[in-house]
Amino acid sequence: MKPVMALVGRANVGKSTLFNRLTRSRDALVADFAGLTRDRHYGNGKQGRHEYIVIDTGGFEPDVASGIYREMARQTQQAIAEADVVVFVVDVRAGVTAQDHDIAHYLRRAGKPCVLAANKAEGMQQDQGGKWAEFYELGLGTVHPVSAAHGQGIRSLVEMALEPLSPPDDGADAAARDLPDADGVDGVDGVDGADGRIIRLAVAGRPNVGKSTLINTWLGEERLVAFDTPGTTRDAITVPFERNGQRFELVDTAGLRRKGKVFAAVEKFSVVKTLQAIESAHVVLLLLDASQGVTEQDAHIAGYILESGRAVVLAVNKWDATDDYQRQLLERSIETRLAFLKFASLHRISAKKRQGLGPLWTAIVQAHKAATCKMSTPVLTRLLLEAVQFQSPQRQGLFRPKMRYAHQGGMNPPVIVIHGNGLEHVTDTYKRFLEGRFRKEFDLVGTPLRIELKTSHNPYVDEGRGGR
C-alpha cells in the first residue's frame, strides 16, 4: 500500500511548488475534485525506491473561527488525518512566525509523524546561526533544508519522511521488484493470480453512483460467501469471497462496515482510500451514474486507473432509470471523455434491481486473465514482423525504423518490448497500430497494454566518425 504524505504550512511557503516537484516523476495531477476536495490536491510520485501519494493543502490557520479560511483549515485537518506522515513546510527566509508556532502546536497534538522542511534554502548554509536555530524552537526535531524551486534536498526529504514506513529493502527484494511475480502479477502483493485463484477487485466511482448498493447486493447473494479477514491499520479493508468457484478479494472503497456476521457498505467517499484501493487491486470496476453522464470526477478516477496500469471494467448503473435520449447522451459522453479506456468492456446495469450483474463477473475474470496473459517471444516476434510487412513504420528523413524482435517485459499490465534500430522515430500512430494487432491476437480486453521501444546502437558508428 502506498504511504500518504501531506504537505502542510501557512500560505506562500512553497507547498504547491514542492507538490509539483514531488509528483514530477509521473507528471500527473491525480485528483482535483471540485467541491469535494476544493483545497486538497492529490498526486502520485516516486523518488528512488519510494512510491507515494502526496496531498497539497491550502494555507493552514488551525484556530480560525469562520469563513473560507475555516473551510481551508478543515480541509487541511482532513489531509492530516488521511496521511501517514506530515511534511510541515516553512519559509526559511521569512523566519518563524506566530502562525508557524500555531501549526506546530496542532501537529504535535495530532501525533502524526512529522518532518520539518525549511523551503527556499537555496544558497544558504545550515550553520548560519540564529536563522536556523529558531526553527528548532517549533519542537518538531531536525530541520531539513530544501529548495522546491531548484530541486535541492528533495530526495533526502522523501527518504527522511518515508523510510520509517518502508519495509526492509535487501538485494533479493530489489531484484524481485524488477521482474514479474511468479504468479504473473506485477506490483500487487498478497494475491494468487488467475485460473480460479484470488482476484483482488476494487469498485471505484464518485459518491452516490451506487457502489454501496452494488457491493451489498453482491455480499448478500447466496452464491457469494463472504468472510472476515483482519487487517493492519495502514492496509485497506478487504473482504474475501467466492463466486462460482472463483475466489475474489474485495478492496474497500465505499466504506465497508462490520454488522454482526456480515459486512455492509456505506457510501463514504475518500480520495486516498480510492487511490490506494486502485493501486492494490488486480481489476477495477469503474461505476458510472447513467443519469449524470461522465463527469470530470469520473474522468479523473479513470485516468488514475489507466496510469496505475490496472485492468478495468466499466459499468453504468441506474440504466433502468434513463430514457432513450439520456442513454444516447451517455453513450456519446463515454466515447468522448473516456476514449482512453476504449479497451474496456462496458456494461449497463441496475444494482438496485439486480439487472445485468451476471455478465460483470465474467468480464472481471476476463480482464484479469488478459492482464496476466503470458506471451511467448516467438509468437510476439512473428506478429511484429507480420505487422511490419503489412504496414511499415513511416520513414523519418533518411531513416526508416527497423524492428527486429519482441518479447514480454511484464504483466498486469502486459508490457511488450520491441527491439530494433531507429525506433525513436516510430510515431504514436504506428504504436497504436501495433497495439491493435497484439490485442486482437491475445484477446486483451479490459487491460492496458504498454509497448516499449528499445533501439540498438552500433558501437562502431562514433568510432568511425572520429577517425575521419
Swiss-Prot record:
Q: Where does GTP 2 bind?
A: 205-212, 252-256, 317-320
Please state every residue range assigned to the domain named KH-like.
Answer: 373-457
The record's annotation in Gene3D superfamilies points to: 3.30.300.20, P-loop containing nucleotide triphosphate hydrolases
CDD domains named in the record: EngA1, EngA2
The GO terms this record gives for MF are: GTP binding; ribosome binding
Keyword annotations for this protein, in alphabetical order, are: GTP-binding, Nucleotide-binding, Repeat, Ribosome biogenesis
Q: Where is the EngA-type G domain?
A: 3-169, 199-372
Task: Provide the binding site for GTP 1.
Answer: 9-16, 56-60, 119-122
Could you tell me the Gene Ontology terms of the biological process aspect for this record?
ribosome biogenesis
| InterPro entries per record | G_ENGA (IPR031166), GTP-bd (IPR006073), GTPase_Der (IPR016484), KH_dom-like (IPR032859), KH_dom-like_a/b (IPR015946), P-loop_NTPase (IPR027417), Small_GTP-bd (IPR005225)
What the protein does comes down to: GTPase that plays an essential role in the late steps of ribosome biogenesis.
Subunit structure as annotated in this protein's UniProt entry: Associates with the 50S ribosomal subunit.
The record's listing under HAMAP family reads: GTPase_Der (MF_00195)
Indicate the family of this protein.
Belongs to the TRAFAC class TrmE-Era-EngA-EngB-Septin-like GTPase superfamily. EngA (Der) GTPase family.
NCBIfam families with a match to the protein in the record: GTPase_EngA, small_GTP
Provide the protein name: GTPase Der
Q: Which organism is it from?
A: Verminephrobacter eiseniae (strain EF01-2)
